[in-house]
Amino acid sequence: MSWSPLFTDTLCDSIWKKIHEIASIFLHTDSSNPFLMHGDIGDILFLFYYCSETGNEEYYEKTTRLFFDCIDKQKPLLKTDKDIESLSSFENGLSGFGWSLTHFQAQEITSGDVFDTMGTVDPQILRSMIYHVQNDRYGFLQGASGIALYCLNKPDRFAKEYLNRFVWELYKRICSNKLDGSDDFSIPTGLAGLW
């Protein structure tokens, strides 16, 4: 068996053409959703890496503005008294948004303290992670394991304590055979999201 590259020069040109097209769409499309998977912060994540690869200053300036607009859209949610559990998912909620901020900081795309933005809602998000485990919602996108990923990237003691509690709750469910009845083994919503 001989080795051959997955991407030929011709294919790379087609891929870059599509990437440029996606970047243009993201840059010129407004969304009222500030979240990760279907909203602005996901677009911004793509665009920051796009700018890093291409060195496109115009896109970088617009992406930076989009980032601050996204933070502004998020502020009302961060100061709300409503039930955060419904807004805690990784896919379309505050844990995905917080993960993105932590990722940007770790990659030195942004600077600052994530706690300044997320600190008021973190306790509620982390409690909802435990609630999800206790109610058999383990999935990555909408359940406990996505919130756990957010916790893994946080350097603070509070998040680590909740991760320990997450593992303990999961261990209790495994020991009492509570995972045996699950029929959802998918990554996004089921047990595979844990691994």
Task: Please describe what each predicted stretch is.
Residues 22, 26, 50, 63, ...:
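Alpha-helical solenoid scaffolds that mediate protein-protein interactions
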Residues 23-41, 77-94, 130-142, 177-192:
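Solvent-exposed loop and edge beta-strand segments that line ligand/cofactor-binding
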Residues 138-195:
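Solenoidal tandem-repeat scaffolds enriched in leucines and small polar residues
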Residues 1-4, 42-56, 96-110, 146-158, ...:
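Well-ordered alpha-helical scaffold segments within catalytic/enzyme domains
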Residues 94-131:
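Well-ordered mid-protein domain cores that form the structural environment of catalytic cofactors
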Residues 1-65:
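Low-complexity, Ser/Thr/Pro/Gly-enriched N-terminal "stalk/linker" regions
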Residues 55-88, 92-94, 98-109:
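Post-signal peptide N-terminal segment of secreted/secretory-pathway proteins
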Residues 61-64, 112-119, 161-168:
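Short sequence/structural elements of tandem HEAT/ARM alpha-solenoid repeats
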